[in-house]
A protein has these predicted regions:
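N-terminal secretory signal peptides that target proteins for export/translocation
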Residues: 1-6
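Bacterial N-terminal signal peptides
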Residues: 10-23
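C-terminal edge-of-domain segments
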Residues: 28-31, 142-179
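Short N-terminal segments immediately surrounding and downstream of signal-peptide cleavage
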Residues: 29-48
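Short, P/G- and charge-enriched loop/turn segments at secondary-structure junctions
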Residues: 33-35, 50-51, 136-141
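Extracellular/periplasmic catalytic domains that process cell-envelope and extracellular macromolecules
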Residues: 38-40, 56-58, 65-66, 87, ...
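Short beta-strand segments
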Residues: 42-78, 92-95, 103-105
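Short, structured beta-strand-loop surface elements
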Residues: 79-150, 154-156
Length: 179
């Protein structure tokens, strides 16, 4: 075998191994059926992030939409506490519908993906009367100017009995230990 063929074969094996590893990792977790049902019924989600001291912030109610694969999308100002903490690597704790609704912890990231921006621009006015009449309505201009950003939250771990209490130690993104 030539050096080039060996290199390509090695790269192919490595990519296959990485794909298998990633598919089993928490970052590829999905929303539970309970969460999917709750997303369909809820008008708000409550989001908390992790402060520098490792404790949970206060849960804030926010408008939301989801992607077809049930990834949560919200928008916020680029200098909000949520955005600052997420840039620092904070996960997001999410309660669907109310502060004691179904909860999960997710990998949060700020993205400038035009498709996700467009989803928010399109979905919010359909879901929220205030956006329909022009109040707090997201627009491409706001995204382009950087006055709002998209936060994408991918569910990682279900939190079946977790309640929102600011100042408590935040749960880990790591999967729960089997019983």
């Amino acid at each position: 075998m030539t050096r080039r063929v060996r290199l390509l074969s090695s790269c192919s094996i490595l990519m296959t191994a990485l794909t298998i590893f990633a598919a089993g990792s928490p970052a590829f977790a999905q929303a539970t059926p309970r969460d999917i049902d709750a997303f369909a019924k809820a008008s708000l989600v409550y989001i908390a992030t992790v402060r520098k001291d490792g404790n949970q912030s206060k849960a804030a109610p926010v408008w939301f939409t989801t992607t077809p694969d049930h990834v949560l999308l919200i928008n916020t100002g680029p200098t909000s506490w949520k955005a600052k903490r997420i840039r620092r690597g904070s996960p997001a704790m999410v309660w669907i519908g109310s502060e004691d609704g179904p909860a999960f912890i997710g990998k949060a990231e700020i993205t400038s993906d035009p498709a996700l921006e467009n989803r928010i621009i399109t979905d919010y006015p359909e879901k929220y009367m205030m956006a329909r009449v022009g109040l707090f309505k997201p627009s491409q201009e706001k995204f382009d100017k950087g006055t709002v950003v998209v936060i994408k939250i991918t569910p990682v771990r279900d939190l079946p009995d977790f309640t929102s209490k600011p100042g408590t130690t935040a749960p880990s993104l790591a999967p729960a230990a089997p019983h």
